[in-house]
Amino acid sequence: MKNSSIMFVLIVVFLISSSENQKMVGEAKQCKTGWACFGEDACKEKCMAKYKGVGTVTYFPFPPETIIIYCECLYDC
């Protein structure tokens, strides 16, 4: 149980520290960024409002009940 708590904290720190990192993707001049979010609608709205891009959500389940939601935003650079 203690190891899973430590793992959870490390993943949360990683997600927060990597938020707003922008990277080039492919030759189509698209960039991507990501952040921890609170749902699919919030992800899509923030991505569209801030970057005029498309937001997709990835769920990372951790036992017993905690779920981390990560939003990845693809947009034209």
UniProtKB/Swiss-Prot annotation:
Q: What is its main location?
A: secreted
Q: What's the encoding gene here? A: LCR42
Keyword Disulfide bond in the entry? The reply is yes
* Subcellular location field: Secreted
Coiled coil region boundaries: none
The residue range of the signal peptide is: 1-19
Give GO BP annotations, semicolon-separated: defense response to fungus; killing of cells of another organism
The Swiss-Prot or TrEMBL record describes its family as follows:
Belongs to the DEFL family.
Annotated Gene Ontology cellular component terms: extracellular region
Q: Which cysteines are joined by disulfide bonds?
A: C31-C77, C43-C71, C47-C73
Question: What is the designated name of this protein?
Answer: Putative defensin-like protein 187
Alphabetically list the UniProt keywords: Antimicrobial, Disulfide bond, Fungicide, Plant defense, Secreted, Signal
